[in-house]
Swiss-Prot record:
Sequence repeats lie at residues 355-381, 396-426, 436-462, 478-511. The lineage of its organism: Eukaryota, Metazoa, Chordata, Craniata, Vertebrata. It is found in: Endoplasmic reticulum membrane; Mitochondrion outer membrane. Its main location: endoplasmic reticulum. Residues 537-584 are annotated as: Interaction with SMARCB1. This is Protein phosphatase 1 regulatory subunit 15A. Residues 76-144, 159-178, 191-501, 622-670 are annotated as: Disordered. Residues 78-87, 254-265, 489-501 have a biased composition (Basic and acidic residues). The modification Phosphotyrosine is found at residues 403, 443, 513. It comes from the Eukaryota. The gene is PPP1R15A. Belongs to the PPP1R15 family.
Length: 670
């Protein structure tokens, strides 16, 4: 093998293709792409394979060669491969005549679409092993093209033309001819059904055509079904791929069962297993009949390893045409299946999920009592059977969490009975019955009626003992009772009067005092409503008594005779910094100014007297008239030597008469 060549490994079409078939977007895109590319080259899935036994008809050979030449020119194939392929086809035809081995071994339906798997060799039978595997997969290092015996048509022809060509082909040879006509694209869900026609010479021709879905008439002989194994397998594959547009008749079902009984069960095992799983994904325009479901269940019963996917997917897929009766029948079937599994003690990997999914998936006709009874019976049967299943009964668990508008007291009774049966049974389930736990958390519309009344009655009985020793609280509550008006005061007032042993009080009373008559007794103090009284009894009365006792004990203030000093232990720096502020500076300035004022007054006080002023003017030589007339006062206070020195000096040294006072004042200090 060359280094650049890799073996052709086809994709596992059985596991992946049904998911692609379900995608409506891919189908729409492939349909649009096939319509756009209709004038261009054909796609691999647009091939119509027609195999001839004797390769008769030169016109067909020429047409096949021309179409193959265009196909090779577009897809990069070499004409050398054609000769090899034709030679291989002739050898295969000589090795196993009469069974179309070339179509079965090299170009069966999955391989024609490019979706074959490695396991397809087993389903072809002994006749499908005529060509070696290397020759099937590689021709000169490349995938083998279609042989010359296969007619390639680029565009689909009319049904009438196809029938005429098929008649011409069958008239030329004496062997069986198998023809396949595929839709424009393998993605579209075009109804294709098998149809068999019996010619005059007794030869059977099998054609796969797209039909609109009426009934099928099959007149195939037993010899034809035994000799041709691949058409039946291909038919079963095509049956799994198609989407039915109408109902199948009972004759078709009987013919299918007869063919499947004659054929080998080995190669058809996977196709039978795939059919119910694929049918559940389909959305037919009309509902599937009950006979088909029974037939599928019988086929699935033959192989225990295949899980019950029809019941699993039917709960998730919503079909608008299903009625309440069909839903009830399906649920009855599911409950019977669960009962059979519980009695047989079969530990299946996939348990029946109808009970689990029915609680989550909503259907239009679900809220009925029959379904609830069915669920309760299923849970009871599971509790009675001693089976340790991995999936416990979840209907009681989910019904407590999920709120449904039609929940009534009957559902609660059913849940309680189911939990009691589960408690009595010896089932080791991982999840205990949580209905009792969840019922306390989940709110339901009719819950707060009887339970609250019972709880309030218990509180009232327990609080009657607390109300006895405190009459003041009774009077206060009664006072508030008359002041507050409630719409239901009549019934509450009557109950309160019976409890307190007093007559019913009128809603409105007027006191009229007449002179000389005895005044009426005082009115009864008003009472609180019963709900408030219960709350006061349960919560407020014990706390109030404790508070009152504490207040009575700690009301009087006492001072001790011993005085104790507790020095404040602080740091010196932070304490001084806390005491500093602007007021300290103001105090310092105030004291400094007062000290300066006192000093100046002591020094300048004697010089400001009138006698000192007169002497000063006399010394200057021109005393004023006011000062001359005023006699000099006697010196009462002794003078300091500092003050007396300049005066004595001034008197001892007379000043010259011609000196101006300005110069005299400027040159002396005194």
């Amino acid at each position: 093998m060359a280094p650049g060549q890799m073996p052709h490994q086809p994709a596992p079409w059985r596991g992946t293709h049904p998911l692609f078939l379900l995608s409506p977007l891919m189908g729409l895109l492939s349909r649009a792409w096939s319509l756009l590319r209709a004038p261009g080259p054909p796609e691999p899935w647009l091939v119509e394979a027609v195999t001839e036994a004797d390769q008769g008809g030169a016109g067909l050979e020429d047409e096949a060669k021309a179409s193959l030449a265009t196909y090779h020119a577009l897809w990069g194939r070499h004409p050398q491969e054609e000769t090899k392929d034709s030679g291989a086809a002739e050898e295969d035809r000589e090795a196993s005549p009469g069974a179309c081995p070339n179509l079965e071994a090299k170009h069966s339906l999955p391989e024609a679409w490019g979706l074959s798997d490695d396991d397809d060799e087993k389903y072809g039978g002994e006749e499908a092993t005529g060509v070696p595997r290397e020759q099937k997969e590689f021709m000169d290092g490349q995938p083998a093209p279609l042989p010359l015996s296969l007619l390639i048509r680029s565009l689909p022809d009319l049904p009438g033309e196809e029938e005429s060509k098929e008649e011409a082909v069958t008239g030329g040879g004496g062997n069986e001819v198998t023809a396949f006509s595929f839709p424009l694209s393998h993605w579209e869900c075009c109804p294709g059904e098998e149809e068999e026609e019996e010619e005059e010479n007794g030869e059977a021709v099998r054609v796969c055509r797209p039909v609109n879905g009426a009934t099928e008439e099959r007149t195939q002989t037993e010899a034809a079904t035994k000799t041709s194994m691949s058409p039946s397998s291909v038919g079963s594959h095509l049956r799994a791929w198609e989407c039915c547009s109408g109902k199948e008749s009972e004759e078709e079902e009987k013919d299918k069962q007869a063919e499947k009984g004659d054929a080998d069960p080995g190669p058809h095992f996977t196709s039978l297993a795939q059919r119910p799983s694929l049918r559940t994904w389909q959305h037919p325009s009309s509902a599937i009949t009950e006979e088909e479901e029974d037939r599928d269940s019988e086929e699935m019963g033959a192989s225990s390893s295949v899980p019950l996917t029809s019941a699993f997917l039917s709960d998730w897929v919503y079909q608008p045409e299903d009625t309440e009766e069909e839903d009830e029948e399906e649920e009855d079937c599911d409950s019977e299946a669960t009962e059979d599994e519980g009695e047989a003690e079969v530990s299946s990997a996939t348990p029946p999920p109808s009970a689990f999914l029915s609680a989550w998936v909503y259907r239009p006709g679900e809220d009925t009592e029959e379904e609830e009874d069915c669920d309760s019976e299923a849970t009871e049967d599971e509790g009675e059977a001693e089976v340790s299943s991995a999936t416990p009964p979840t209907s009681a668990f989910l019904s407590a969490w999920v709120y449904q508008p039609g929940d009534t007291e009957e559902e609660e009774d059913c849940d309680s009975e189911a939990t009691e049966d589960e408690g009595e049974a010896e089932v080791s389930s991982a999840t205990p019955p949580p209905s009792a736990f969840l019922s306390a958390w989940v709110y339901r519309p009719g819950e707060d009626t009887e339970e609250e009344d019972e709880y309030e009655d218990e509180d009232n009985e327990s609080g009657a003992a607390d109300l006895g020793p405190s009459p003041s609280l009774q009077t206060q509550s009664a006072l508030l009772r008359d002041q507050i008006y409630q719409p239901g005061e009549k019934t509450d007032g009557g109950e309160a009067a019976e409890k307190w042993g007093e007559a019913e009080s009128c809603p409105f009373r007027v006191a009229i005092y007449l002179p000389g008559e005895k005044p009426p007794p005082p009115w009864d103090p008003p009472r609180l409503p019963l709900r408030l009284q219960r709350r006061l009894k349960s919560a407020q009365t014990p706390t109030r008594h404790q508070d009152l006792e504490r207040l009575l004990k700690t009301r009087k203030v006492r001072f001790s005779e011993k005085v104790s000093i507790h020095p404040l232990v602080v740091w010196a720096g932070p304490a001084q910094a806390a005491r500093r502020g602007p007021w300290e500076q103001f105090a310092r300035d105030r004291s400094r100014f007062a000290r300066r004022i006192a000093q100046v007054q002591e020094e300048l006080g004697p010089y400001l007297t009138p006698a000192a002023r007169a002497r000063a003017w006399a010394r200057l030589g021109n005393p004023p008239t006011s000062l001359a007339t005023v006699p000099a006062p006697t010196q009462t206070s002794p003078m300091t030597p500092i003050q007396a020195t300049p005066l004595s000096h001034a008197l001892a040294s007379p000043s010259p008469p011609c000196v101006s006072p300005s110069l005299d004042l400027s040159g002396r200090r005194g």
